[in-house]
């Protein structure tokens, strides 16, 4: 069977198109790929593989230029053929939701995979493993899924006239957007609309998912990230409306925030993070909120866990803690609320439902800098930045490291260095590599060396999180943490 015939057959079987539409669909494909593809045969069977072959044929026929951007634009246009229009996707979702919210979510997740919006083939390239630590097993990933632009495309992007449409990658206007060299193609993108606390929000999946069913909840309006009482209301509303999913927010200040601060959004999904499994190491009750179970969890960052069957109580208490933290200083442990009116304190909040109760984890954040730590006092320090120097956002806070692609080769190079196969490593890894070599001077087995290096990466990630923690895991640090808790007000009954 020809490539076009096979692709069109798949489109008909996996969409609302019918056999009568075959000629129409064939012509839609030829218009995008080029008529020279008509006689091309294929032995591929899967829809996404067929799409990929059509894209390569378009490059061969010079219908599109040989660039990553052109490939992505054509690929999303082809997959748009198997994707219902936004109104139909939303209608299907809410009709299914009326009978089973879980089924509605599952159907939308399956659609987002089937139409290649979630890049399963790319995500499969990621390296992922677990490492033991004093805080339980942590998750390490080396992110290889996001394609890196080649130098030619980066140069072209600099010459492209600035555009404010869409305003950012999280705006609703991305739905169906054609794409350009400096903005991703989104022809096959669909967003579920829903109302939350009186405003329109959107629900979509992340194309380059970091964990199972990684999704994004985005404000219908282009408004900046802001942690407030409304954040706690919305996060708890999400975990109630989207059963089985957690929901969390990045912090809203530089250094301790995420990569997108210009558009209010939350992340969620169906994944149990290491932090969720962390036990309470100290429990107490806050005054006026005696019915809310509260405590500090055993975690490298500073986390208060609140549990209750009352959303209202959790929202009120979380807001009280947040407001107190924003203005709280303790010079004995280098904690400062503001400098000349510039705030330093915020929270990374995470919500979930567990055993029928609502749960909020409030991670205390401080974005101060100093002469010794110009990148951030509570940010990965210089000696661990060879592994992780980016902001510690929501996902890392919960115990999942997202490490840069360079580490794939660099980890292997350090392992080769340990067994004497390589004489050099990257300059920024030299001290680390020498330290490992002195600890394991007689290593000859490359696989064993690789395991040692990967475990060491995990140990460094623990340090990264400890650096980001405002109250350290020391007697002084934990005593200071309790001073803050007492400042909020605990029940002495």
UniProtKB/Swiss-Prot annotation:
<comment type="similarity">
    <text>Belongs to the galactose-1-phosphate uridylyltransferase type 2 family.</text>
</comment>
<dbReference type="InterPro" id="IPR005849">
    <property type="entry name" value="GalP_Utransf_N"/>
</dbReference>
<keyword id="KW-0808">Transferase</keyword>
<comment type="pathway">
    <text>Carbohydrate metabolism; galactose metabolism.</text>
</comment>
<keyword id="KW-0548">Nucleotidyltransferase</keyword>
<dbReference type="GO" id="GO:0005737">
    <property type="term" value="C:cytoplasm"/>
</dbReference>
<dbReference type="Pfam" id="PF02744">
    <property type="entry name" value="GalP_UDP_tr_C"/>
</dbReference>
<dbReference type="InterPro" id="IPR005850">
    <property type="entry name" value="GalP_Utransf_C"/>
</dbReference>
<keyword id="KW-0963">Cytoplasm</keyword>
<dbReference type="GO" id="GO:0006012">
    <property type="term" value="P:galactose metabolic process"/>
</dbReference>
<dbReference type="InterPro" id="IPR000766">
    <property type="entry name" value="GalP_uridyl_Trfase_II"/>
</dbReference>
<dbReference type="InterPro" id="IPR023425">
    <property type="entry name" value="GalP_uridyl_Trfase_II_CS"/>
</dbReference>
<keyword id="KW-0299">Galactose metabolism</keyword>
<keyword id="KW-0119">Carbohydrate metabolism</keyword>
<dbReference type="Pfam" id="PF01087">
    <property type="entry name" value="GalP_UDP_transf"/>
</dbReference>
<protein>
    <recommendedName>
        <fullName>Galactose-1-phosphate uridylyltransferase</fullName>
        <ecNumber>2.7.7.12</ecNumber>
    </recommendedName>
</protein>
<dbReference type="GO" id="GO:0008108">
    <property type="term" value="F:UDP-glucose:hexose-1-phosphate uridylyltransferase activity"/>
</dbReference>
């Amino acid at each position: 069977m020809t490539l076009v015939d096979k692709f069109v057959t798949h489109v008909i079987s996996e969409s609302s198109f019918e056999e009568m539409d075959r000629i129409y669909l064939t012509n839609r494909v030829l218009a995008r790929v080029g008529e020279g593809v008509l006689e091309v045969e294929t032995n591929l069977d899967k829809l996404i593989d067929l799409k990929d072959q059509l894209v390569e044929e378009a490059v061969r026929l010079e219908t599109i230029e040989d660039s990553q951007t052109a490939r992505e634009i054509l690929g999303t246009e082809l997959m748009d053929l198997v994707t219902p229009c936004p109104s139909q996707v939303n209608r299907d979702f809410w009709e299914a939701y009326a009978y089973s919210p879980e089924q509605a979510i599952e159907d939308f997740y399956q659609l987002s995979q089937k139409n290649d919006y979630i890049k399963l083939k790319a995500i499969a390239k990621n390296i992922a493993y677990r490492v033991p630590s004093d805080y339980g097993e942590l998750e390490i990933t080396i992110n290889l899924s996001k394609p890196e632009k080649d130098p030619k495309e980066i140069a072209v992007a600099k010459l492209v006239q600035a555009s404010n449409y869409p305003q950012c990658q999280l705006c609703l206007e991305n739905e169906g957007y054609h794409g350009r060299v400096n903005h991703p193609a989104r022809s096959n993108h669909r967003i579920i609309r829903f109302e939350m606390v009186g405003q329109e929000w959107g629900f979509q999946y992340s194309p380059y998912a970091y964990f199972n069913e990684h999704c994004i909840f985005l404000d219908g309006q282009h408004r900046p990230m802001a942690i407030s009482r409304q954040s706690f209301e919305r996060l708890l509303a999400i975990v109630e409306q989207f059963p089985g999913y957690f929901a969390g927010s990045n912090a809203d200040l530089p250094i301790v925030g995420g990569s997108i601060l210009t558009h209010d959004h939350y992340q969620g999904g169906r994944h149990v993070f290491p932090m969720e499994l962390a036990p309470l190491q100290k429990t107490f009750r806050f005054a006026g909120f005696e019915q809310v179970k509260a405590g500090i969890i055993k975690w490298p960052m500073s986390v208060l866990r609140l549990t209750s069957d009352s959303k209202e109580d959790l929202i009120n208490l979380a807001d009280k803690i947040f407001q107190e933290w924003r203005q709280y200083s303790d010079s004995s442990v280098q904690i400062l609320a503001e400098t000349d009116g510039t705030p330093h304190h915020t929270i990374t909040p995470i919500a979930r439902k567990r055993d029928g109760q609502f749960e909020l984890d409030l991670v205390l954040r401080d974005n101060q800098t100093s002469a010794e730590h110009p990148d951030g006092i509570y940010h990965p320090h210089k000696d661990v930045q060879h592994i992780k120097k980016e902001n510690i956002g929501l996902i890392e806070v919960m115990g999942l490291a997202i490490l840069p692609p360079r580490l794939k080769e660099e980890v292997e190079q350090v392992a080769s260095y340990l067994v004497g196969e390589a004489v050099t490593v990257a300059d920024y890894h030299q001290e680390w590599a020498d330290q490992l070599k002195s600890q394991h001077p007689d290593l000859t087995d490359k696989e064993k060396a690789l395991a040692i290096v990967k475990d060491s990466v995990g140990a460094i990630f623990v340090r990264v999180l400890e650096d980001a923690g405002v109250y350290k895991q020391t007697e002084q640090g934990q005593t200071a943490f309790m001073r803050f808790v007492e400042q909020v007000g605990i029940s002495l009954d």
